Amino acid sequence: MAKELKFSEDARSKMLAGVDKLANTVKTTLGPKGRNVVLEQSYGNPTITNDGVTIAKAIELEDHFENMGAKLVSEVASKTNDIAGDGTTTATVLTQAIVNEGMKNVTAGANPVGIRRGIEKATGAAVDALHKMSHDVKTKDDIAQIASISSASKETGKLIADAMEKVGNDGVITIEESRGVDTSLDVVEGMQFDRGYMSQYMVTDNDKMEANLDNPYILITDKKIANIQDILPLLQSVVEQSRSLLIIADDITGEALPTLVLNKMRGTFNVVAVKAPGFGDRRKAQLQDIAVLTGGTVITDDLGLNLKDTTIDQLGQAQKVNVTKDDTTVVEGAGSKDQIAARVAEIKGQIEDTTSDFDRDKLKERLAKLSGGVAVVRVGAATETELKERKYRIEDALNATRAAVEEGFVAGGGTALINVIGDVAKLEAEGDEKTGINIVLRALEEPVRQIAQNAGVEGSVVVEHLKGEKPGVGYNAADNKYEDMVAAGITDPTKVTRSALQNAASVSALLLTTEAVVAEKPEDNPAPAAPAANPGMGGMM
């Protein structure tokens, strides 16, 4: 297909239009008085959300060049979400501010490479300043406050604080849909290990790119599966019972994996394959832990067991299994409580006996997975639309809380970004590099300005007021007053704020140094739509 090219100012202006269209949609959701956005779905009811990355991913612009600009901003939101789990709207606002200020200067004749150096220098100084002002998460109240701010709900904040208290800061917390209208917290026996699906075609939820199996059988083996015939009798037994299957194996190679994927895509049965966790003796021990938890048997040569002879009775079972590209979570395994307790006691004995600190840490990790359980937040709502919106908020709050536990927290509401302006302004530079620093200085004001505007207040007035306040004092948009943000419990995870700024600066600098854009050329005479099928030919394939 022929390509269409645009250069210099023409290229940048088109991409800027795309940046603005996406950012103007996303930034209306920022802050406690931000609005929602309604997204049309290809099927089912529309989705109502204020989640920045969800909105960004949903936007496709008709103009190819504008769409490329929009997709670059969407990439900023996605990357921030992947790293920190929240802060996607802030990242979008920062990107728009840097790109707009940068484009003005490039159009006026500034060298984009010099501007890029200045942006990178200023961003580094801002991140260093953020780390210096960061507070550590010390109490349950700290966790509740961070989760409350992210979800705009004190009830959600308390729920997540309770969940983390029960399973620990590093514990496994999953979010499920409830059948009722109430949102509740349960702690169930479960385990998570760091292995994801072998093929993305095994996912059941394309939006989140994860596979969810309800009441599955679980095949646990330390063998490689290269020939589908080795497990064909077992697969047939699983299909006969209309159950899904999780396969945990050393590896699946040859024609076995494509065959499993093909049957999954055809709807023959629901199957997900993951590699066994760990290596060597630790792998054997972890597989045995999974077997005990799920009531299954490890199919291994050590026990003289073959895959061809494996029966349904040797498979483990669980209430639910969730598999992402990185992790597998098994919830409510069908194992005997007595056997689980015995396994826990055995691991505790090994912890006492070992002389290796490394081995002790690994044993404690296994013990936590086996005995700590999984906290399950069951989200309830009156309608499906409300349920999705509430679920997005709780997921954001959980991600924000984990980020805060990892790197601490700073004053919220964009206050921390205002507070680092002084450190960035001290940087020495000349020419276009100085211009790049000034661009970042202006962008650091933008989140506060947007939060204020969404609350119906003049943003520039708020920004100028905060510049004259002592560090930590910010604008509480919910109550329309200035106060010490940390003391008021209005905080943001340092990791979220840092990631939003770094990702925004990175993509913006690349966009400013773009000189040519190549896109697919629209067809002048698109092919006519296929005629409707003859009603008399029904049933033919």
From Swiss-Prot:
SUPFAM superfamilies: GroEL apical domain-like, GroEL equatorial domain-like. Residues 521-541 are annotated as: Disordered. GO terms for molecular function: ATP binding; ATP-dependent protein folding chaperone; isomerase activity; unfolded protein binding. Its EC number is 5.6.1.7. It is found in: Cytoplasm. Signal peptide: none annotated. Pfam families: Cpn60_TCP1 (PF00118). CDD domains: GroEL (cd03344). GO terms for cellular component: cytoplasm. It catalyses: ATP + H2O + a folded polypeptide = ADP + phosphate + an unfolded polypeptide. One of its GO terms (biological process) is protein refolding. Keywords: ATP-binding, Chaperone, Cytoplasm, Isomerase, Nucleotide-binding. Its main location: cytoplasm. The keyword Cytoplasm applies. Residues 526-535 have a biased composition (Low complexity). ATP binds at residues 29-32, 86-90, 413, 476-478, 492. Together with its co-chaperonin GroES, plays an essential role in assisting protein folding. The GroEL-GroES system forms a nano-cage that allows encapsulation of the non-native substrate proteins and provides a physical environment optimized to promote and accelerate protein folding. Forms a cylinder of 14 subunits composed of two heptameric rings stacked back-to-back. Interacts with the co-chaperonin GroES. Belongs to the chaperonin (HSP60) family. This is Chaperonin GroEL.
